[in-house]
Each structure stands twice: as C-alpha cells, then as structure tokens.
From Swiss-Prot:
Name of the protein in question: Large ribosomal subunit protein uL29
CDD domains: Ribosomal_L29_HIP
Annotated signal peptide: none
Domain of life: Bacteria
GO molecular function, one term: structural constituent of ribosome
NCBIfam families: L29
One CC-aspect GO term: cytosolic large ribosomal subunit
Gene Ontology biological-process entries: translation
Keyword Ribonucleoprotein tagged: yes
UniProt keyword list: Ribonucleoprotein, Ribosomal protein
Amino acid sequence: MARPNASELRQLSDADITEQINGLRRELFDLRFQQATRQLGNTHRFKQSRIKLAQLLTVQKERQSSTAS
C-alpha cells in the first residue's frame, strides 16, 4: 500500500475523504482487535493506516479552515 501524495489527497471530494477516514478508523479498530487476539501478522499496517488517516484528517482540516475564513 503506497502512501498517496498530499496533492492526490487534495483532489478527492469531501465525501470521498470522509468515507476513507471512516474506513481507516474501522480498519484500525479491526487491527487492534486482531493484535489483542494475537491473529495479526503484518504489524506495519498499523503505521501505514495511521499515517494515511493523519494525512486525510489534515486535508479535511485545511478545507474546513479555508471555508471558515
């Protein structure tokens, strides 16, 4: 799973960003559950998911602050 550039994320619509954020939060929940039950094989997915979630949240906040001003 390659990390997308910020410019690629900025091209997404607000609905797509929200959908991906919700999907990543669900994925992180599932990964934590798998880790707790010792079923998780690739622990690097935690880092990848957290980074992508942070990037999406940053783009979302940028849009909110630009529309508020």
